[in-house]
């Protein structure tokens, strides 16, 4: 909240302490101030695995200028970052290193899944590809596309900033059981896997 002086034209010597504070101070809550500072100072850590990362790097160019949103400083270490951007195809061999990097990030932390492969496995419905990065880490914003355009990345960043600005997180966050948050829910593509695989079983020539 802010304090509005009742007599803006009054001489300084006639103003009360409250009047002086209203002219030079802004009052707010610690939670709002913390959320505002986090919103305008995201520290991203990019985890690029495939062609989507090319579009993600394009956002850093002067044409799109990601620096306008306070997220231009790419961190080289997850210990210095609070935003993890996963772009590209996540193979099962990469799941464990990616989870380790996520666990090294300081809380609070956020995750953006960029591209169809990071969101749901994309067209790689095979044994070696994780069908969505949210299988092992929570995702805050999904960016569909193969690959997404740079404008979509900026839209996702703005959407995440709105979410961060409205959160009321303390300075430290303890994540409890996530069983009820839908991370372990069965995927529709997994439920229909047998049905789709049956379509590849053709009738033998002698039956025609």
Swiss-Prot record:
GO cellular component: plasma membrane; respiratory chain complex I
Subcellular location: Cell inner membrane
Disulfide bond sites: none
Its EC number(s): 7.1.1.-
Assigned protein family: Belongs to the complex I 20 kDa subunit family.
Keyword Protein biosynthesis: no
Necessary cofactors: [4Fe-4S] cluster
Record's cofactor remark: Binds 1 [4Fe-4S] cluster.
Protein name as catalogued: NADH-quinone oxidoreductase subunit B 2
HAMAP family tied to this protein: NDH1_NuoB
Subunit: NDH-1 is composed of 14 different subunits. Subunits NuoB, C, D, E, F, and G constitute the peripheral sector of the complex.
A GO MF label: quinone binding
Biased composition (Basic and acidic residues): 185-197
Segments for region (Disordered): 182-208
Keywords: 4Fe-4S, Cell inner membrane, Cell membrane, Iron, Iron-sulfur, Membrane, Metal-binding, NAD, Quinone, Translocase, Transport, Ubiquinone
Lineage of the species this protein comes from: Bacteria, Pseudomonadati, Pseudomonadota, Alphaproteobacteria, Hyphomicrobiales
The keyword Cell inner membrane is annotated on this UniProt entry: yes
Catalyses which reaction(s): a quinone + NADH + 5 H(+)(in) = a quinol + NAD(+) + 4 H(+)(out)
Topological relation to the membrane, as annotated: Peripheral membrane protein
Residues involved in [4Fe-4S] cluster binding: 51-52, 117, 146
Known function: NDH-1 shuttles electrons from NADH, via FMN and iron-sulfur (Fe-S) centers, to quinones in the respiratory chain. The immediate electron acceptor for the enzyme in this species is believed to be ubiquinone. Couples the redox reaction to proton translocation (for every two electrons transferred, four hydrogen ions are translocated across the cytoplasmic membrane), and thus conserves the redox energy in a proton gradient.
Organism: Rhodopseudomonas palustris (strain TIE-1)
Pfam families the UniProt entry points to: Oxidored_q6 (PF01058)
GO biological process, one term: aerobic respiration
């Amino acid at each position: 909240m802010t304090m509005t002086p009742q007599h803006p034209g009054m001489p300084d010597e006639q103003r009360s302490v409250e009047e002086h504070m209203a002219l030079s101070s802004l009052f707010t809550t610690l939670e709002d101030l913390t959320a505002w500072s986090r919103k305008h100072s995201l520290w991203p850590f990019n985890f690029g695995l495939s062609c989507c990362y090319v579009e993600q790097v394009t956002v850093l160019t002067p044409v799109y200028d990601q620096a306008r949103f306070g997220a231009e400083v790419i961190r080289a270490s997850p210990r210095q970052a609070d935003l993890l951007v996963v772009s590209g195809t996540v193979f099962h061999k990469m799941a464990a290193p990616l989870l380790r990097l996520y666990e090294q990030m300081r809380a609070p932390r956020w995750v953006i899944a960029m591209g169809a492969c990071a969101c749901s496995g994309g067209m790689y419905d095979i044994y070696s590809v994780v069908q969505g990065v949210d299988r092992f880490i929570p995702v805050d914003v999904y960016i569909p596309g193969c690959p997404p355009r740079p404008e979509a990345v900026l839209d996702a960043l703005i959407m995440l900033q709105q979410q961060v600005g409205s959160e009321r997180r303390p300075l430290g966050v303890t994540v409890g059981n996530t069983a009820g948050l839908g991370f372990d829910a069965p995927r529709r593509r997994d439920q229909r896997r047998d049905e789709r695989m049956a379509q590849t079983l053709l009738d033998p020539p002698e039956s025609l």
